[in-house]
Amino acid sequence: MLYIFRLIITVIYSILVCVFGSIYCLFSPRNPKHVATFGHMFGRLAPLFGLKVECRKPTDAESYGNAIYIANHQNNYDMVTASNIVQPPTVTVGKKSLLWIPFFGQLYWLTGNLLIDRNNRTKAHGTIAEVVNHFKKRRISIWMFPEGTRSRGRGLLPFKTGAFHAAIAAGVPIIPVCVSTTSNKINLNRLHNGLVIVEMLPPIDVSQYGKDQVRELAAHCRSIMEQKIAELDKEVAEREAAGKV
């Protein structure tokens, strides 16, 4: 019964956000500031799922300039966990098929997110060039999931190199965002589903990396994130066991 209640409320809330959000965005379409606004609105669903989301970020995070944010991509619950920490003006890079999701697809495009055709390598590389051009024209940051797909309980997957090519080409730092494990954690028929920690790490300077060191940079970032996620998972387990959620 709790599952059905949560599902109904989530669907109604999401449709309302997408419909009225799309109308709102028509007055300033493709404005990158909208992404954080509506990302935070979806983040408000966390308590409905019985989750306490704790966000941590450096004290000067709101003053960061252009950057590429990279985050671990676990499942659909990323929409109510990682979305809470998105900083304006940040847009995401998502697959083109997202456009076909009723209501959400239209909002996703209107808020200024970038779409990539993963089935066409030429167009995919073109998107990286587009990202670099965006950095040159205005103050904007890009949010990417370097794993390229949801991990679904398989741990941190190998990183694809697109985000790191773009960072080196544009000369902007990479900012890792780590989310504690949510796979196999959430039971929608259970009232309380515990703690999730979302932590933004300090920027990683890419100026010391050349175009031929993309994989080295990717491996370095993945190592940092893997270690931090393990630390967060340990903290979550200890706090939940002690009832200090």
Swiss-Prot record:
Membrane topology qualifier: Peripheral membrane protein
Pfam name, any one: Acyltransferase
Classification via PANTHER family: 1-ACYL-SN-GLYCEROL-3-PHOSPHATE ACYLTRANSFERASE (PTHR10434:SF11)
GO-annotated cellular components: plasma membrane
Keyword presence, Cell inner membrane: yes
Pathway connected to this protein: Phospholipid metabolism; CDP-diacylglycerol biosynthesis; CDP-diacylglycerol from sn-glycerol 3-phosphate: step 2/3
Transmembrane segment boundaries: none
Source superkingdom: Bacteria
EC number assigned by the record: 2.3.1.51, 2.3.1.n4
Name under which the protein is recorded: 1-acyl-sn-glycerol-3-phosphate acyltransferase
Places the protein is found: Cell inner membrane
